[in-house]
C-alpha cells in the first residue's frame, strides 16, 4: 500500500492531462460531477458508476447501544448512513493488486 490519497485536485489534474480541458474547466467538471453525486445521495437516490460500484444511503432505526468503557446502555438515534458496494470488477482489480 502506498498510503497516498487521491484528491479532488488529483482528479482535476488527470482530467486536464487526459481530456485536454483547461485547468479551470477540469476543476469545474470534477466539482460538478461530485455535486451531482452528493445531491442524488442527499435525495435518497443510488449512485451507480459502472465497473466501479454503487453508493447508497441506508436508514438505520433507533436502537440501544452500550458504552464500551462503562457498560452503560445508551440510546442511539435513527440516522442515515452512506454505504458503498464495489462492483465485482473493482473487487477483482483490487484483489489482483494485492497479489503483486
Swiss-Prot record:
Family annotation (InterPro entries): Hist_DNA-bd, Histone-like_DNA-bd_CS, IHF-like_DNA-bd_dom_sf, IHF_alpha
Keywords attached to this entry: DNA recombination, DNA-binding, Transcription, Transcription regulation, Translation regulation
GO biological process: DNA recombination; positive regulation of metabolic process; regulation of DNA-templated transcription; regulation of translation
Pfam short name (any one): Bac_DNA_binding
GO MF term list: DNA binding; structural constituent of chromatin
HAMAP family per record: IHF_alpha
Function (record text): This protein is one of the two subunits of integration host factor, a specific DNA-binding protein that functions in genetic recombination as well as in transcriptional and translational control.
Complexes and interactors: Heterodimer of an alpha and a beta chain.
Protein's name in the database: Integration host factor subunit alpha
Amino acid at each position: 500500500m502506498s498510503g497516498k490519497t487521491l484528491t479532488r485536485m488529483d482528479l482535476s489534474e488527470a482530467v486536464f492531462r487526459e481530456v485536454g480541458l483547461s485547468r479551470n474547466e477540469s476543476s469545474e467538471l470534477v466539482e460538478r460531477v461530485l455535486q451531482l453525486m452528493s445531491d442524488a445521495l442527499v435525495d435518497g437516490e443510488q449512485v451507480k458508476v459502472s465497473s466501479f460500484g454503487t453508493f447508497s444511503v441506508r436508514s438505520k432505526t433507533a436502537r440501544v447501544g452500550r458504552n464500551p468503557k462503562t457498560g452503560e446502555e445508551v440510546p442511539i438515534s435513527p440516522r442515515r448512513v452512506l454505504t458503498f458496494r464495489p462492483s465485482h470488477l473493482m473487487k477483482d482489480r483490487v484483489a489482483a493488486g494485492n497479489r503483486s
